[in-house]
Regions:
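Conserved alpha-helical scaffold segments that buttress catalytic/binding sites
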Residues: 2-45, 51-272, 276-387
Length: 387
């Protein structure tokens, strides 16, 4: 694996953080001369300086080290999981070569049960991240925190604003569901909205999400891979992005969403993309990203394998009948109080899609069912599972 990486520059490293204090940079393994020992590592940080397929955002390839300068300065958390910064992926002769390197590294780390953090770079790197799961033969859910869907034209070359189509059309296809959190209607073609509906993908508009952020927690809890486009954050909080606008998530909101991602027992990949240091003002965007990482890591530290398993006796199980037509089974954790619901499927298919027939939900979904209404989240998944 070492052959895929360039070490973190030692000269810059001395500037990153004070050496005498309890900073994150003093409490993690960093690839300087010797490649980190991955035994016992919970989180691996991967920088990728690839920007050749960025959509009007050249300069975002400089992001990884700019983020490190701010991230390493933050104070370490109590009970912080073991972290290794593996350095930056060596840029290939072509962008596809970089995709290959990233997918190979990601596949090896995921197979070892190590959560990966990708510091882009342009967001088309999400496609390379997806290829790692394809290589492993794992069906996954992807959640994109983004102001757009990034679907693009099926005949167009891959770009950071058109990579989802490449994932949808990949063969073999291991994508079960794609969810968007934070799209802005005036930036999205109505035809793309119709396509999302046709494909039974989830789309959550920025205004609805901001009104009740907690309702998007189950969306993120159901993801294996979360990809964050920094253009989803409004300009006043993250000016260092070429396509950012006046509306979007606040700093507090995006940190909450990344904390949800970290706490998700299912999630194995997390990436932050499209930050451009050349456009940043007083390192404000880099500081916000470093805090997003801090909250993500805090979420990982709080994981406790909180998944429905009635045999262990750690969940309540509720049966809700709706108009004598449907019976929906809900699960509530006795420790976290989070909710899940079960989708009835053919017993022969349960093993194939076992990670998807019990899906995360909210208490609001349970209360909706108690009022004899079918939760939209339940129906959406039911349509995907029952042809």
């Amino acid at each position: 694996m070492k052959a895929f990486f360039n070490p973190v520059n030692r000269e810059n490293l001395d500037f990153f953080f004070p050496k005498t204090e309890n900073r994150i940079g003093n409490n993690i393994q960093i690839y300087e001369k010797d490649f980190p020992n991955l035994e016992g590592v919970k989180i691996a940080i991967i920088g990728v300086e690839e920007e050749r397929n960025a959509a009007d955002n050249l300069g975002c390839g400089q992001a990884p080290d700019a983020i490190r300068k701010q991230f390493y300065r933050l104070f370490a958390q109590n009970n912080m999981p073991a972290i290794a910064d593996l350095g930056n992926i060596k840029i290939g002769k072509t962008a596809n070569d970089t995709y290959f390197a990233l997918s190979e590294v990601a596949a090896q780390l995921i197979e070892r049960g190590i959560v990966i953090i990708i510091l882009g770079g342009s967001q088309d790197l999400t496609y390379a991240n997806y290829l790692a799961y394809q290589q492993l033969g794992r069906t996954i859910n992807i959640t994109g925190i983004d102001q757009k869907f990034d679907i693009g034209d099926e005949h167009a070359d891959i770009k950071s604003d058109s990579y989802i189509n490449k994932i949808i059309l990949s063969n073999p296809n291991v994508l079960f569901n794609y969810s968007n959190v934070g799209y802005q209607s005036y930036l999205v073609d109505t035809e793309e909205i119709k396509l999302m509906e046709k494909l039974l993908f989830d789309a959550h508009r920025i205004g609805i999400v901001k009104r009740d952020l907690v309702e998007c927690e189950p969306v993120i809890r159901g993801a294996d891979l979360v990809s964050v486009d920094m253009n989803a954050v409004r300009f006043s909080y993250a000016p260092g992005c070429n396509n950012v606008g006046p509306n979007g998530f606040s700093g507090e909101e995006i940190c909450t969403l990344t904390n949800y991602a970290g706490a998700n027992d299912r999630l194995s990949s997390f990436g932050i993309y499209e930050y451009n240091p050349q456009l940043d003002i007083m390192n404000q965007s880099a500081m916000l990203i470093s805090q997003m990482l801090w909250y993500f890591i805090q979420g990982v530290s709080l994981r406790n394998n909180d998944l429905p398993d009635i045999a262990k006796g750690n969940f309540y199980k509720y049966f809700v009948s709706i108009l004598d037509t449907y019976q929906i089974v809900f699960y509530q954790s006795k420790t976290s109080h989070l909710w899940w619901m079960e989708i009835p499927i053919n017993e022969n298919n349960k093993e194939k899609i076992s990670r998807n027939y019990i899906i995360p939900c909210s208490e609001k979904d349970y209360l909706t069912a108690c009022n004899e209404e079918i939760p939209e989240r339940w129906m959406q998944t039911y349509k995907k599972l029952i042809p």
